[in-house]
Amino acid sequence: ETITKASRADYRHKKQSGGAGQFGEVHLIIEPYEEGMPKPDTYKFGGQEFKMNVKDTQEIPLEWGGKLVVCNCIVGGAIDARFIPAIVKGLMDRIEQGPLTGSYARDVRVCIYDGKMHPVDSNEISFRLAGRNAFAQAFKEANPKILEPVYDVEVLVPSERMGDVMSDLQGRRAI
């Protein structure tokens, strides 16, 4: 799976059950990633402009190919730096099981630009879940597509079966 356009999402994870609760809010923008892209600068969504001030960038190579690129664009301490790794874990949870079909996702840049935390109720699990759900929400709105596997094969058949085999291969979109 991958995406074909930029998208924005906010997600608030809030759980209260007596005692210390869970709270984490993440605001992010995702876009298709290509090697050599310039740093993100400004995004426009629904008439709103979002300026990015990239503090840190992580390029995470994925085992199945492609990359996840995470840009920390948070200003003013809206989210403590100690919660960024938890957000990245949440992103990886969804990359490993893409939001569309559960297949691996790849080649996505994520800019975390805002959020909220609570002095008592914020913890790593809250931000992991907030990051995971914000990513899933943004992914579904970013015109996702399923990547088809491509194989290079050589087929040897007797000449009397050539027509049947060619017909079958063309039915499977072979070239």
Feature names for model-found ranges:
Residues E1-I175:
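Accessory interaction regions appended to the cores of large information-processing enzymes
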